Amino acid sequence: MTRHFLRDDDLSPAEQAEVLDLAVQLKRERWSERPLAGPQTVAVIFDKSSTRTRVSFAVGIADLGGVPLIISTANSQLGGKETASDTARVLERQVAAIVWRTYGQAGLEEMAAGTTVPVVNALSDDFHPCQLLADLLTIREHRGDPAGQTLTFLGDGACNMAQSYLLAGATAGMHVRIAAPAGYVPSEAVVADAERIAASTGGSVRVLTDPVEAVSGADVVVTDTWVSMGREEEKAQRLAELGAYQVTTELMEHAVDDAIFLHCLPADREYEVASEVIDGPRSVVWDEAENRLHAQKALLVWLLRQS
C-alpha cells in the first residue's frame, strides 16, 4: 500500500522512531542507501519560494541516486487549468515520488488520493512535518531521546510549525506547551488529535498564554516567524500582539540550564527571537537546518520501502 506523509501523525510512534533511526544512519553514512539509483526522478513542486526545502530535497534526492525535478506552479498547469488529482495521475507514470510545498492541506490530500506514488508535504498552511523530523533528530543529538522532555513553542500558536509540534511532539512522547495570545491558538481539532496521541505515548499537551509559565522547566524552546508569507499586510498588528512572546536571554533563563533553542528559519531577528539567543550557546539552529537533509532522505527511503 502506498504511504504518504501529509501530517506528522501519518507516522505512528514506532514508525517515527524508525525514520529517525534511519536519519541517524544516513547522517553517519551519507550514501549508504540508494533506492533511487537508475536514476529515478522525484518531482519537487513549489507554490512558495524556498531555500532550505529546495536545497535539502534536491541534494537529498541526488544522494539517494535520483534526479530532482523542480517544478514551479507558476510555470505549470497545477493549480490553474489542471487539478491536483489529474497532475498526480500524470506524474506517477514518470516519477518515484512527489514532494509539494504548497498552501492548502486539501490540495495535498487530493493529490495523495489520486496517485500510487508517495506524496510528501514539504510545507502547507496547516503543517510542516518534514521540519519536525529534522527537529526531533536535532533534539536526539543534543538532548537524547525526546520522550519525556518538555518542549515549549512561543508566538503564533495557529501557525503550521506550532500545529506540527503538537502532533509530532505527542507522537514522540514529549510534553508540548504552546504559549500564544488569544487569537493565535492552534486548531481545536489538532489539539484534540495531539491529546489523543499523547494519551498513548505518555506525553502531554498544554496551550497557555503566559510565556514565562510556558518556558519554566522547558528542555527545548522554539519559535517561528510571526509574519509568514502572505501575511505581510498584518505585520504591524502581529508585532504588537505577539511582542511579549519574543525569545530573549531573560526568558531562556526560566528553562532548564542545558535547554536548547530551535528555529526552522528564516528568522526575523529582534522580532520573534533576539540575536543574542539565536547566536548564543543554547542555539542549535544550524544543526537543525542541516538535519533537514538527513531527515528527509530517511523519510523518502522509508516511504519507498513501504510503497
From Swiss-Prot:
Keywords: Amino-acid biosynthesis, Arginine biosynthesis, Cytoplasm, Transferase. Pathway: Amino-acid biosynthesis; L-arginine biosynthesis; L-arginine from L-ornithine and carbamoyl phosphate: step 1/3. Carbamoyl phosphate binds at S50, T51, R52, T53, Q77, R101, H128, P129, C130, Q131, C264, L265, R292. InterPro entries: Asp/Orn_carbamoyltranf_P-bd (IPR006132), Asp/Orn_carbamoylTrfase (IPR006130), Asp/Orn_carbamoylTrfase_sf (IPR036901), Asp_carbamoyltransf_Asp/Orn-bd (IPR006131), Orn/put_carbamltrans (IPR002292), OTCase_ArgI (IPR024904). The keyword Electron transport does not apply. One of its GO terms (molecular function) is ornithine carbamoyltransferase activity. PANTHER family: ORNITHINE CARBAMOYLTRANSFERASE, MITOCHONDRIAL, ORNITHINE TRANSCARBAMYLASE, MITOCHONDRIAL. This is Ornithine carbamoyltransferase. The lineage of its organism: Bacteria, Bacillati, Actinomycetota, Actinomycetes, Micrococcales.
